[in-house]
Amino acid sequence: MTSPAAFPGGACFAFTIMDDTDNATVENVQPIYRLLESLGMRTTKTVWPVRCEEGSEMFGAGETLDDPGYRDFVVDLGRRGFEIAFHGATMESSHRERTMRGLNRFTEMFGPPRVHANHSFNRENLYWGVDRIDDPILRAAYRAALGHPDDFYQGHVPGSAFWWGDLCAGQIKYVRNLTFDEINLRRVNPSMPYSDDRRPYVPWWFSASDAENVDAFVELISVGNQSRLEAEGGVCIVATHLGKGFCVNGAVRDDVRELLVRLAERRGWFVPVGPMLDELRVRRTDRALPPGEWRRMQWRWARDLMLRRLATLRRARKRKGAQNQRRVGSQM
């Protein structure tokens, strides 16, 4: 377990953001980072160190460290106290050689990465797909939902073309796994960060609060949730994509700005993921995750994932209905 003592500086809760770099460009994320800096918040930004030579249908709009303007922007973020983290070598699956090239590029610019998050369906993802979890019922359900063979993700499989588990174990300290629709992660994973002997190539795992895009982020950090996070002395690491709608026409969306300003006025500890997990780790009395906690986490993650998928379908139907109404109206 992790001690619930107050945080450094007398803060009574901890909050940060882990920004997955999908779709990120200088244009669509710079304003939100300037806002975070002005509020005294320092967060974590993941990057892709090298370009994707084969192109990417889903993520091709995102920039990498091979883009000079983006590279300069990210280097400047690091100088300003933001943490730069690894999101794989690039936006599509990478064999070991490209992953090594990406890690070397990252290390040359920022030093070895301390924090990593798997990306989408990249085959070099570590302990991904059904290997994220152990519960046999949930593994069977997730297998059916994904439609991937069990050995699709091979970053942790020695001898695979996608193998890089040894590199992770030697360089990276923290890797993200399960995410939840919960602002206070102490409610679902009080033993974070934790080690898992069944997944030995990751030194420490951590959980996150899920906010896929700007609308989910606004819902997650509502004023009511902020008040609860503060009252409970909670920990929040938001897994999100700051390139997905946070900035419009060069400005941070009004509701995002208002909520972040209100959050910054509270007695929070606003540091990047790595330093936050370092502080939580030294409070651990052991490295392991209690079996009961892990069992509850898996089922809560599965429930939250299903509810998010249903909510996405409802929003899509609502948008389609609105489009149909406009189409009918224009024909009258």
Each model region followed by its residue ranges:
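Catalytic alpha-helical scaffold of carbohydrate-active enzymes acting on polysaccharides/glycoconjugates
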Residues: M1-V202, A216-V238, F246-M332
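Short, glycine-/Ser/Thr-/acidic-enriched flexible segments
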Residues: G243
